[in-house]
Amino acid sequence: MEAFTRLDAKAAPLPLANIDTDQIIPKQFLKTVERAGLAKGLFYDLRFDEQGREKPNFVLNRPEYKGAGVLVAGDNFGCGSSREHAPWALMDFGIRCVISTSFADIFYGNCFQNGLLPVVLKAEEVQQLMDEARGGNHVVSVDLEAQTVTSPSGAVFRFEIDPQRKDKMLRGLDAIGETLQSQKDIDVYEMKRALAQPWLEGA
C-alpha cells in the first residue's frame, strides 16, 4: 500500500449528502477483484448519461477539476452496502483523500486498508473548503503528520485520527503489510510447531 504523508492537490466539491457505495461504484463494476480500471465506474450514474456520454456539469467532468486528488463531500459519505471497490475506484481515479463531516463506519475502515485518507471536519470547515474549491484556486494541502488541512486561502483546519491508523497510513501498511512486520516471529512459530507436531506437516 502506498504511504500517505502529505498531499497538495486540487479539491473537487461534491455537496451531496448520503452518497452511498452504489453511487460511488455501481454493482455492474463489482465483477472484478482487480483494482486497476475501476475509475471508469466511479460515480458512473452521476458522471454519464444513459448513452454513456459525460455530463458536462458534473464536477469531476469539468476541466478545472481534472486531476483532482481531494474530494470534499457531503455528510454521511460512503453509506450503504460494504464494498471495498468503493475506495478502490476513488484511488484508481486519482483521489487520495476524501473530506466530509462524517463517513459510514465500514467505508471509513476500508479507506485506511487501501491508502485513501478519510478526513472528518466540522460542517463550517467543510463548507468553507467547498466554497473555496469553487473559486479560481482549487489546491488544498492535507498533512497527515500534522493532522491539518490547509484551504486554498490559507485557513488551517485540524482533524482527529486514531493513532494506530495514522501510523499505518504514514508507513503504508495494510492488514497484510502489518502481518508481515511479524514475519520473523511467524517463522519461529512455524519451526517450533513443525518440531512439536511433525504429523501436521503436509496436512
Swiss-Prot record:
InterPro entries: 3-IsopropMal_deHydase_ssu, Aconitase/3IPM_dehydase_swvl, AconitaseA/IPMdHydase_ssu_swvl, IPMI_Swivel, LeuD
Coiled-coil annotated residue ranges, if any: none
GO biological process, one term: L-leucine biosynthetic process
Listed GO CC annotations: 3-isopropylmalate dehydratase complex
Enzyme Commission code: 4.2.1.33
GO molecular function (one): 3-isopropylmalate dehydratase activity
Similarity remark: Belongs to the LeuD family. LeuD type 1 subfamily.
Entry function: Catalyzes the isomerization between 2-isopropylmalate and 3-isopropylmalate, via the formation of 2-isopropylmaleate.
Name of protein: 3-isopropylmalate dehydratase small subunit
